[in-house]
Amino acid sequence: AGTAPADLTVAQLESLKEVCEANLACEHMMDVSGIIAAYTAYYGPIPY
């Protein structure tokens, strides 16, 4: 469930990254697994 990465705009992805980068653990997971996986793991479904 949730939003497929291809459905997100660049601006939406950037805003997710900004939220994730405020959390060191999320930022690390983003580097390993990608922004979609990291954001949903720490913050739940993508709100778009």
Curated annotation (Swiss-Prot):
Q: What is its main location?
A: secreted
What is this protein called in UniProt? Osteocalcin
Name of the coding gene: bglap
Q: Which GO terms describe its cellular component?
A: extracellular region
Which GO annotations describe the biological process of this protein? biomineral tissue development; bone development; cellular response to insulin stimulus; glucose homeostasis; negative regulation of bone development; osteoblast differentiation; regulation of cellular response to insulin stimulus; response to vitamin K
Tell me which domain of life the UniProt entry assigns to the organism this sequence originates from: Eukaryota
Molecular-function GO terms, alphabetical:
calcium ion binding; hormone activity; hydroxyapatite binding; structural constituent of bone
Q: Which family does it belong to?
A: Belongs to the osteocalcin/matrix Gla protein family.
